[in-house]
Amino acid sequence: MAAGLATWLPFARAAAVGWLPLAQQPLPPAPGVKASRGDEVLVVNVSGRRFETWKNTLDRYPDTLLGSSEKEFFYDADSGEYFFDRDPDMFRHVLNFYRTGRLHCPRQECIQAFDEELAFYGLVPELVGDCCLEEYRDRKKENAERLAEDEEAEQAGDGPALPAGSSLRQRLWRAFENPHTSTAALVFYYVTGFFIAVSVIANVVETIPCRGSARRSSREQPCGERFPQAFFCMDTACVLIFTGEYLLRLFAAPSRCRFLRSVMSLIDVVAILPYYIGLLVPKNDDVSGAFVTLRVFRVFRIFKFSRHSQGLRILGYTLKSCASELGFLLFSLTMAIIIFATVMFYAEKGTNKTNFTSIPAAFWYTIVTMTTLGYGDMVPSTIAGKIFGSICSLSGVLVIALPVPVIVSNFSRIYHQNQRADKRRAQQKVRLARIRLAKSGTTNAFLQYKQNGGLEDSGSGEEQALCVRNRSAFEQQHHHLLHCLEKTTCHEFTDELTFSEALGAVSPGGRTSRSTSVSSQPVGPGSLLSSCCPRRAKRRAIRLANSTASVSRGSMQELDMLAGLRRSHAPQSRSSLNAKPHDSLDLNCDSRDFVAAIISIPTPPANTPDESQPSSPGGGGRAGSTLRNSSLGTPCLFPETVKISSL
């Protein structure tokens, strides 16, 4: 026992001595003391998803929204949380930035939405980490290019319809840039395409050797020299068409300076200029070489097909977007050509009858070898020349193959962007067509029901209900809206303009009104306004309550969509559905088939000097009203016509 105690006692003493420095230090504070330092937990509620973090974590970046006192504007005292109506998935990356100091860009999120979230929280895009910075910039550049191309396509392509008062230049430019807008533009589009093809084919055919007849010499001559008159007439017709097109485009261009600097304008000038120079320059031996050189430029007419081919335009956009990669390829090839041409010249310099007479002469061999063509007109004969020729061939394959995937990816990207843009435009056209069709269909059905007596009154007194027969929910709601409009405006629905006509509607009196006000009522003997207040007949502008436009009393107003007409009572009219003589009107029906819509008429302010009492909708002297529609027979027109608007 004593031996065992003597064994472990030195170790115990050593351990006690080791603990002495720690025992002299004060004990750590209790857990409750830590909360008094001011480091508290903040709860951030982002669209219902709660995030918790330390206050000191957010205070690291005081120039941002969460790190500054501006976040107190979003504090909810009832729940004790900071509420932000933003994207919670995006906020996760924002909060990680406060924790780690590195901002990461999510791949699955839209880059534009990510930028909007950064702008809201006061973070700059330069804070994106190095791991995501390159991809972030590429995606942002691609998105900017796509938006710019879509905007340009909308401006030059199937944009919105031109207003009714558009100028001749605007209509011409729209016809040139979008031939499918009208039949005449489409015909001109195909005519110019036909003459472009004729010009290119004639330029090729005139160089084919043609044999003469048996009686004449059998010496072959080009077809252009044997039949000069025919080719001159074809060339003249084509150039006249191209000249007329160019002048019309120049006249209709929104910016003529920009049009003159465009690539297609230069192509048009190069295509037609040789013809006019050939007419002015005399044909003699001194200028024959220059004349032949000018005729070569006629081949550039083939680039006019780029206006008629979407694939050629995509190829042009691809080459434009790959300018940096193509520049790198050209620079690399130039360096390799100079190096290998120099090596091949000195390797073949000592041989007899060598074709490598100089370094520029060796350029041809190097270019043909690096592009893997290998014509065989120049070949090395020494062992060193063959070795360096093999290295030149392999290096050419590597240098040329490197930029190809980048060009292919850009072409695929631009092609799919154009496909998506075309699809969006087609979907927009279909959507607008469906809206017009549904609107026109329900309107015509409403008029037909009125003509056939399909709409009847049921009930009496304040229990007015509109009975319908075999109609869809959309039709029922639309008909109910028109019915309520009739009751509140004291006029029957007669006709509805089309969608495009309604957008371009112009008031006959030069005035517009944004609400169905009392100024839209007819003024005359026996009308509602004249019977209640004769001063309304004066043409004096007033400001109505709940109205943003100043209207004129006693003037005929054209507001938006509908037209009303007062005339005598007819057997099939629904005069009982309009305003009643008493003041209590049931504006909505109690049927379950409809969505109630309350439509109120703004009334003049009570402090108007010349109006003591508002007019009653059921004033005396109001004649019965009937239906007027062009499809229902010849209507009887009366001079008191007023147009009312749909809501």
Curated annotation (Swiss-Prot):
Binding-site list for Zn(2+): H104, C131, C132
Phosphoserine: residues bearing it: S458, S555
UniProt subcellular location: Cell membrane
Tissue specificity: Widely expressed. Highly expressed in brain, in particular in cerebellum and thalamus; detected at lower levels in the other parts of the brain.
Membrane topology qualifier: Multi-pass membrane protein
Single GO term (MF): metal ion binding
Pfam families, A to Z: BTB_2 (PF02214), DUF3399 (PF11879), Ion_trans (PF00520), Shal-type (PF11601)
Regions that enter the bilayer but do not cross it: 360-371, 372-379
Gene Ontology CC entries for this record: dendritic spine; neuronal cell body; plasma membrane; postsynaptic membrane; voltage-gated potassium channel complex
UniProt protein name: A-type voltage-gated potassium channel KCND1
Lineage start: Eukaryota, Metazoa, Chordata, Craniata, Vertebrata
Encoding gene (name): KCND1
